[in-house]
Amino acid sequence: MNLLYPFIISFSMIFFAELGDKTQLLVLSFSTKNKAYKILLGVALGTFFSHGLAILFGSKLASFSHISFQFYLKLFTYFSFILFGIIGFLPEKPNTNTTKKPSFFSRFSHLHLGAIGMIAISIIVGELGDKTFLASLGLGLEYPLYKFSLICGSIAGMVLSNLLAIFCGK
C-alpha cells in the first residue's frame, strides 16, 4: 500500500465528518475578527496536535497482538463515532443557570498567545473526544504503519472543511 491511499482515506473521512460540526461553528465565529490565513494556521496547528495524538494513540493500541482485543476496540471506536453523530442531531436542553462563568478565552488571555495560538488551543480543546477525533483514533487503529499520511490527510481535511466556514463568515 502506498502513502497516498491512507492520506485520501483520512482526508475524506475527516472532511465529511467535520461538515456541520461544532469546530466549524467555532471557526465561523473566528472568521468575523481574524484573517483567513491566521485561522487556517491555527486550525492546522490544533489539528496536528489533537488528531496527531489520536492517530498515535490508535496506532499504539493497534500494536497489541490479541486479535479479539483489536476487533472490539475497532468496534467500540466506530460505534462511538456513529453515536456521536446521532447525538449531534438531538436538541439540547435550555440552560436555566443565570450565573456568568468566565469564558474559555479569558482564562488564556494572560498568556499573550496571539490569534493563531488561541485558535490552535480552541481547536485542540474542541476536538478532544469529538467525532473527528474518534475517527482519527479509528484510522490509527486501521492503518498503524501510515501515521504521517494519516496526520497529513487529517490536517488537510480539517483545513479544507473549515475553509468553507471561513468563506461563509466573510
Model-derived regions, located:
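Membrane helix-loop-helix hairpins that form the core translocation module of multi-pass transporters
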Residues: K35-F104, L164-K170
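Alpha-helical transmembrane segments of multi-pass membrane proteins
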Residues: M13-A17, T47, S80-G88, S122-G126, ...
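Residue-level signature of catalytic and energy-coupling elements of molecular machines
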Residues: D21, I82, D130
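Selected transmembrane alpha-helices and immediately adjacent juxtamembrane segments
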Residues: L90-P91, T98-F133, L139
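Juxtamembrane transmembrane-helix termini in multi-pass membrane transport proteins
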Residues: N2-F69, L134-G157
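Physicochemical signature of membrane-embedded alpha-helices that form the seven-helix bundle of GPCRs
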Residues: M13, L73-F76, H110
